[in-house]
């Protein structure tokens, strides 16, 4: 009997839709012409004034403190965020599954424990946390957006989920990722297209785009994503959030589902998306204080450190990757940051030239598919799943082909050689951190996110990078320069299609890059920078 992939998707989506309680459904959905839907949760009448305040006003650190001070209960928080997540799903398609009753039961347990003992179970006690779907949660699906895996139920929590749960977090929903988990957008045959809550003609990013959209519409305060080419940073940027791509080997990936477990030429990472620098610190400290290296032999036994930034922070300014220049909104955000920081003697700004970023893309795009994509094609073919355009695009980069072991060794040596060259390149400038765009545009139009190099280069180099919001697109300020002379065909294509009206209300963010395994120093530097912006 031939399995029809449409039936698999329909069954999965029926379960998703059935997880939304009837009282949480919007009576009249906005028309498709309504692009910015970020205010609808607070205006649709489903949330109480207190629920609006709890979901909109605070970051995760503040909510954890409010629980500690007995100003709010976990049940109240979980109820508010579950209701808002249900609303968000109806507006932007950013939830794979809402497990309201399960979350409510856990929240009640935590409230009762605190009432009886006067002690918190951990630093995230009672705080609702959302999770990208391929990061396993016990008794829930772990499809990684492959239709062939749609019936797989995780038998246990991934290591990271177990750690965050032990820290007191309450998991309440899973969020979608794209087909193959390899788009800077979020579209799949399993759950459809996730759109940006600030402008539904734009992408929320990917591959942690469900998390990005959910946090962007304030239906989550802290989310867990993953990143192998920009998959935390792209959604964070597109939705005006903070998002950290940690250095590898600090947080466990055990229990994260995908197609190529065991591939080590380019390691993916897991990390947080949230509303503040201190939330990034809260998450990382909570996870690493648990000593995850005692359960995952791949991790570095490196405790989380409390550090302060240097009195004078030397910031490298990389305005462009010299392959595709940023469009006017991104260039303006860079200039805004430069102007503010240059006024303060505590910042020493130095222009830094990129080092062969075109080569970095040729290298990493080849390393993503060492078997030429065979494992992925086999999974698609197993149920006749159609290959989506962005999957086709990334799997057909010019250097993608099957490799024998000798070719893998050669490629890995080339990676290490590039890392060493870049190490010396940055040492010559003597910078503490690099300030760069996250991409050449604000959130791309749906189906058009085809330039990864502003983020993927740091995956190749394994440097920690964190995204932070700066401004929003302003059609009056971000006018197109009709006299612009492009550097090459890619740059021409990026600039010729630019129109500020297309990006109405889109957040504009920047990226700060640190030194390998100095994630603490990176966040300390960002905290100092954000205080000036």
Curated annotation (Swiss-Prot):
Top-level taxonomic group: Eukaryota
Cell compartment(s), UniProt: Cytoplasm; Nucleus
Catalytic residues in the record: 132, 207, 231
One term of GO molecular function: fatty acid amide hydrolase activity
EC primary class: hydrolase
Catalytic activity field: a monocarboxylic acid amide + H2O = a monocarboxylate + NH4(+)
One annotated GO biological process: fatty acid catabolic process
Keyword list, A-Z: Cytoplasm, Hydrolase, Nucleus
GO CC terms of this entry: cytoplasm; cytosol; nucleus
InterPro entries per UniProt: Amidase_CS, Amidase_dom, AS_sf
EC number(s) per entry: 3.5.1.4
PANTHER family in the record: AMIDASE C550.07-RELATED, AMIDASE-RELATED-RELATED
Family label: Belongs to the amidase family.
Name recorded for this polypeptide: Putative amidase C550.07
Source organism (scientific name): Schizosaccharomyces pombe (strain 972 / ATCC 24843) (Fission yeast)
């Amino acid at each position: 009997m031939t399995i029809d992939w449409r039936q698999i998707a329909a069954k999965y989506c029926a379960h998703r839709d059935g997880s939304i309680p009837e009282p949480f459904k919007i009576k009249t959905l906005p028309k498709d012409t309504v692009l910015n839907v970020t205010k609808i949760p607070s205006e649709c009448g489903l949330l109480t004034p207190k629920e609006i305040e709890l979901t909109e006003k605070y970051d995760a650190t503040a909510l954890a403190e409010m629980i500690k001070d007995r100003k709010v209960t976990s049940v109240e928080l979980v109820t508010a965020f579950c209701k808002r997540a249900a609303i968000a799903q109806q507006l932007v398609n950013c939830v794979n599954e809402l497990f309201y009753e399960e979350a409510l039961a856990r929240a009640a347990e935590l409230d009762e424990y605190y009432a009886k003992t006067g002690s918190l179970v951990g630093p995230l006690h009672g705080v609702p946390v959302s999770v990208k779907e391929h990061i396993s949660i016990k008794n829930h699906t772990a499809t990684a957006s492959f239709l062939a895996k749609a019936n797989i139920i995780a038998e246990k929590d991934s290591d990271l989920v177990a750690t965050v749960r032990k820290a007191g977090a309450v998991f309440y929903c899973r969020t979608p990722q794209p087909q193959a988990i390899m788009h800077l957008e979020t579209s799949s045959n399993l759950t459809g297209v996730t759109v940006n809550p600030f402008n539904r003609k734009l992408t929320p990013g990917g591959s942690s785009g469900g998390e990005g959209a959910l946090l962007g519409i304030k239906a989550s305060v802290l989310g867990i994503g993953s990143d192998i080419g920009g998959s935390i940073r792209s959604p964070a940027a597109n939705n005006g959030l903070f998002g950290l791509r940690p250095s590898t080997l600090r947080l466990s990936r055990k229990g994260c589902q995908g197609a190529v477990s065991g591939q080590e030429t380019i390691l993916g990472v897991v990390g947080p998306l949230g509303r503040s620098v201190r939330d990034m610190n809260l998450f990382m400290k909570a996870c690493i204080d648990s000593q995850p290296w005692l359960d995952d032999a791949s991790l570095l036994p490196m405790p989380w450190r409390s550090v302060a930034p240097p009195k004078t922070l030397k910031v490298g300014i990389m305005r462009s990757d010299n392959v595709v220049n940023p469009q006017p909104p991104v260039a303006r955000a860079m200039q805004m940051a430069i102007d503010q920081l240059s006024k303060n003697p505590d910042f020493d700004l130095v222009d830094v030239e990129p080092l062969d970023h075109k080569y970095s893309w040729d290298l990493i795009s080849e390393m993503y598919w060492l078997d030429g994509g065979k494992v992925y094609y086999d999974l698609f073919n197993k149920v006749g799943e159609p290959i989506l355009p962005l999957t086709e695009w990334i799997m057909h980069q010019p250097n993608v082909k099957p490799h024998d072991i000798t070719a893998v060794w050669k490629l890995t040596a080339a990676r290490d050689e590039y890392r060493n060259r870049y190490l010396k390149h940055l040492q010559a400038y003597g910078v503490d951190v690099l300030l760069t765009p996250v991409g050449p545009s604000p959130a791309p139009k749906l189906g058009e996110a085809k330039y990864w190099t502003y983020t993927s280069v740091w995956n190749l180099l394994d440097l920690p990078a964190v995204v932070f919001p700066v401004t929003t697109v302003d059609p009056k300020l971000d006018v197109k320069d009709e006299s612009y002379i492009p550097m090459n065909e890619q740059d021409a294509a990026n600039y010729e299609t630019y129109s500020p009206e297309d990006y109405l209300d889109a957040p504009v963010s920047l990226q700060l890059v640190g030194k390998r395994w100095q994630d603490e120093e990176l966040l300390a530097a960002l905290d100092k920078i954000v205080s000036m912006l």
